Curated annotation (Swiss-Prot):
Species the sequence originates in: Takifugu rubripes (Japanese pufferfish)
Record-given protein name: Doublesex- and mab-3-related transcription factor A2
Chain ranges of the DMA domain: 227-262
PANTHER family xrefs: DOUBLESEX AND MAB-3 RELATED TRANSCRIPTION FACTOR DMRT, DOUBLESEX- AND MAB-3-RELATED TRANSCRIPTION FACTOR A2
Segments of skewed composition (Polar residues): 131-154
């Protein structure tokens, strides 16, 4: 009797006695076929079916997969927060989780959204007024621009900067102000007072600029970007003054790459005069250099005749350039080799660079057709004949009167 009470209904017993239910393919079920889902997805006959039922099943599967992934991510984040709370306490754990990016911090616009939406119109009107006043004030000198940039940096360091400091501190906005002063829109403002038509024209012309200003981040982020540019310049050029680097950056429109190129060009021009890194770096010269076009390339000013190997190093010349003597620089040029100790000749210059993979210019290859670099004319036509012709007085009395090149090349008469 007790066994009959503990036994369930016959229908449930019949279902429990059979094998457990296995998942079936929904696409096959839509088309009247029952097939187990395990190992069947790749070989399903209706895996690419686009009927209404199969499309609905595919959409449900996609939504379910997204929900499972989201729940899994949320569970992982909750576990991490719980571990941090156990390690550091409740408040410290939440702060550390927000700092590490586990919990996204609440943005500021959610707290101050209503206040910013209410004061949007007032800020736009104030921006128009400050913009027009900044344009009518006239172009500023480099010293004033440097002072304004310094004041803008000091004001924007805590994150609270005034609109005037913001407009006066950036070089790109100063350039826009100069172009705006030269535009015909600002002429009625200079001649007469501010009329409603002029104000509306200013608003219509500069509406895109105001939209850009509204879309830009806060002035503190702009100031931090400017500070990053100044820090980059000070690290690249530690020997230059910070004020000069600020002026160069402001003259180049906050473009760090252009400022670096400008400083390198000016320092290269000063290096020829043997001047120090800070000598001649005046604000006027820097601003003039930033506005002037770059100097023409050296190839345009080069003479038509090939340059002498002694005039510059052989590393930037072709290996097939003719050899010409440069006697004042023979001793100082690192690409010369003293061969006169054995052959009674002045030091011969290499046709290839000393550190390259070329062969040294040796005397057995100087005849026509054997010398690899000068094989088109006889040796007398080349300009290095006087190099061979000038022999030292020390070896004149030795047995090399005929020389390796004959009496005509050596410009001496054979001794009888």
């Amino acid at each position: 009797m007790a066994g009959n009470l503990l036994r369930g209904p016959p229908l449930l017993l019949r279902a429990s006695d059979k094998y457990p239910r296995t998942p079936k393919c929904a696409r096959c079920r839509n088309h009247g076929v029952v097939s187990a889902l395990k190992g069947h997805k790749r070989y399903c006959r209706w895996k690419d079916c686009m009927c209404a039922k199969c499309t609905l099943i595919a959409e449900r599967q996609r939504v379910m997969a997204a929900q499972v992934a989201l729940r899994r991510q949320q569970a992982q984040e909750e576990n991490e927060v719980r571990e941090l709370q156990l390690l550091y306490g409740t408040a410290e754990g939440l702060a550390l989780a927000a700092a590490n990016g586990i919990i996204p911090p609440r943005p500021n616009y959610e707290v101050f959204g209503s206040v910013s939406s209410e004061s949007n119109s007032d800020s736009s009107v104030q921006k128009f007024e400050t913009f027009s006043k900044g344009q009518l004030s006239g172009p500023t000198t480099p010293q004033q621009a440097a002072g304004k940039s310094a004041s803008a940096e000091s004001d924007s360091a805590p994150g609270m900067s005034s609109p005037d400091g913001r407009h006066g501190g950036s070089g790109s906005e100063n350039g826009d102000s100069e172009s705006f002063i030269n535009s015909p829109v600002s002429k009625p403002l200079k001649d007469g007072g501010e009329t409603p038509g002029s104000v509306s024209s200013i608003g219509s012309d500069s509406g895109s600029e105001t939209d850009k200003d509204e879309q830009e981040p806060s002035p503190s982020s702009a100031a931090s970007r400017h500070m990053n540019a100044i820090d980059i310049l000070t690290r690249v050029f530690p020997s230059h003054k910070r004020s000069i680097l600020e002026l160069v950056l402001q003259g180049c429109g906050k473009d760090v790459v252009q400022a670096i190129e400008q400083i390198l060009n000016n320092s290269g021009a000063q290096g020829s005069n043997k001047a120090g890194p800070d000598e001649g770096w005046t604000a006027e010269r820097m601003l003039q250099g930033a506005q002037q076009p770059p100097p023409p390339p050296a190839a345009s000013t080069a003479p038509t005749r090939p340059l002498l190997p002694g005039a510059m190093t052989l590393s930037n010349r072709s290996a097939f350039s003719p050899l010409q003597p440069n006697t004042p620089h023979f001793g100082a040029d690192p690409s010369t080799y003293p061969l006169g100790t054995h052959l009674g000749l002045n030091p011969l210059r290499l046709a290839y660079s000393a550190h390259g993979r070329g062969l040294a210019f040796m005397t057995p290859y100087s005849t026509t057709g054997l010398m690899p670099t000068l094989g088109f004319r006889p040796p007398m036509d080349y300009a290095f004949s006087d190099l061979i012709r000038d022999r030292t007085m020390l070896h004149k009395e030795q047995g090399y009167s005929g020389g390796l090149y004959g009496p005509l090349v050596n410009n001496t008469t054979e001794k009888q």
